[in-house]
Amino acid sequence: MSLSPHQKTAGGLVLVVAVMGAASFAAVPFYNWFCRVTGFAGTTAVATEAPAEVLDRTVKVRFDASREAGMPWEFRPLQREMELKIGETGLAFYEAYNPTDRTVAGTASYNVTPDAAGGYFAKIACFCFTEQVLAPGERVEMPVTFYVDPAIIDDPDGRYVRQITLSYTFHETALTEEQAALAAESATDVN
């Protein structure tokens, strides 16, 4: 059975659309993985504990929040900035609110600017390490514990950093079957 040129073209176009759809679905997790592995685009380090050394020099850390188009949550930092000593542990909070009538899951991608600070900005604990699930009308405060590594002062570019911006963008993710079943059960219980 031979395909006509029109059928081959239509089949090729369907394949292109399917590949593009699959690539867009996988883009956020792949980008997060790529940035963590390479340190690209100011991706931060992950640490288990703060350094023993705390310097007298301070750095101002600013906090930024945004949402991917279509993400229905409200999302914001609870403080705009803080100043801390290099090596000192900082604790900041972000707030997320789900104003919809459905359960919504999301993950946060993150980066630090300037890029020279990315490898020296370390998170000990962060809401961005796991998926967040908010029920309808739920509001949560989400912490991030971090520090700026004292090694930054030995870096030819990093030593001039006086201000760092930590940015998060929340992306909606599909609910797992278990989460969707719990959400449906909760909605049924209300009615």
Curated annotation (Swiss-Prot):
Cytoplasmic side stretches: 1-9
Presence of keyword Cell inner membrane: yes
InterPro entries: CtaG/Cox11_dom_sf, Cyt_c_oxidase_assmbl_CtaG
One GO BP annotation of this record: respiratory chain complex IV assembly
Transmembrane regions listed in the UniProt entry: 10-30
Pfam name, any one: CtaG_Cox11
PANTHER family to which the protein is assigned, alphabetical: CYTOCHROME C OXIDASE ASSEMBLY PROTEIN COX11, MITOCHONDRIAL-RELATED, CYTOCHROME C OXIDASE ASSEMBLY PROTEIN COX11-RELATED
Record's protein name: Cytochrome c oxidase assembly protein CtaG
Organism whose genome encodes this protein: Cereibacter sphaeroides (strain ATCC 17029 / ATH 2.4.9)
